[in-house]
Amino acid sequence: MPAYPKNYPFYNWVPKPIGIIILFMFFLPILTVGGTYSASGTEMMSGLGIISEHIQFANFATSIGMAAFCPFLYRLGCIRREKMMCIAGFSLMYIFSYICAKTDSIFLLALCSLFMGFLRMVLMMVNLFTLIKYAGHMEATEKITPGNEPLTGKGWDKLDIERSAAQPAIYLFFMVLGQLGTSLTAWLTYEYEWQYVYYFMMGLLLLCILITFVTMPYHKYTTRRFPINFKQFGNASIFCITLTCITYVLTYGKVLDWYDDPTIQWATVGAVVAGILFVHIEVTLRNPYYQFDVLKLRTIRFGFLFYFLLMVLNSSSMFVNVFTGIGMKLDNYQNATLGNWSMLGYFIGGIATIWLSVKGVHFKYLFAAGFLFLGLSAMFMYFEVQGAGLYERMKYPIIIRSTGMMLLYSLIPTFATQRMPYKYLSSWICTMLTVRMVLAPSIGTALYSN
């Protein structure tokens, strides 16, 4: 990798602790800003006269945008222009947030959500790589550069141990920050109106742009050639169309009476045609956008299956929201406050995962423990509902489920990427997000809602 200025990406007058705080602060809008906010869903539905499926579909569109970015991960990491990418990314997110706050078009809302999901992943990865370089003095891209794989079995074992410790810490940080963002949006909706969530986030984006202007100097490209082939954005578009059609069918199927509705029929045809076209293009290209060879790896297939089971099971968390919302008459703010207990579960699960992984506990026992926690949470809910349920006791299934979620969330990628060549990493992350955030949740929601 090329050399960077001593205090990259900041001016030399910026103290290192302040720079670290700034980079951490940037994660708040990156992880929180979106086309829709679940915590303000009820108020948004009543304000716009829309149904809950519209909110779900927009949320899935955000996840599709995030997955569509992943094959560009390594090439984006090579650009390394924090100031340019933060200003451009935050500015575009500001524009899309403004459109989402003003529009009553579901199509426009979903389209902006998709773009914002793509931008979220761009900014998240750029900021994460920069933070690791700035605070940890480590070049993260070296750990994902094809050709830098360990050459011996001991080297791979050491890498697996490092991942077992690092990935739970990273997941813990992102999941806790995401929950804090949910609580913030719920509070804003409760105290003001749902539109004010967008306006607050727009103000936060402007603040981040201002801080970027003041604290970061201009940096030239570190390579002669721009690393991203813009032709592959066409492939990414077909990928997005395929997943959007699938999620449309699964989200609106019950409301529109499935295949009695022509839009469901056309969406199915669109998913099949776009899916076949995407596979054909990727298989025949010399430098594909998505490498299907990643699915030939046994650990990747198991990771795919585990994530699918995990997210289908986790979709049952909707029963907690239904019970607290309808049965206990709680509003979104109280639900979000109750959801804050998940941070305790994340912390317990994260610490336990790191400790047990370093101790060398076999994956099968850790996976069994994770799914056991999910089962215990569902069992607790069953008996609690039978006993009419108390608000004070609803925190226990949330803590138990989030502990199991943290165990599985952080361990499945570690298991799936064992001995995996780095050239497949971007395609694996795309597969992981597609299953974890799009396909499995949409299928799970369709199953439970029917």
Q: Where are the language model's segments positioned?
A:
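Intracellular juxtamembrane helix-capping segments at the cytosolic ends
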Residues: 122-157, 407-421
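Extracytoplasmic
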Residues: 3, 13-74, 123-124, 128, ...
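12-transmembrane solute porter fold
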Residues: 17-31, 38-39, 289-449
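Helix-breaking motifs and short loop linkers at transmembrane-helix boundaries and internal kinks
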Residues: 49, 81, 100-108, 119, ...
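Structural signature of the two symmetry-related core transmembrane helices
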Residues: 84-99, 107, 365-380
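Paired small-residue
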Residues: 107-116, 392-400
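Glycine-rich segments within core transmembrane alpha-helices of 12-TM secondary carriers
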Residues: 143-183, 433-445
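Hydrophobic transmembrane-helix bundles of small-molecule transporters
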Residues: 190-305
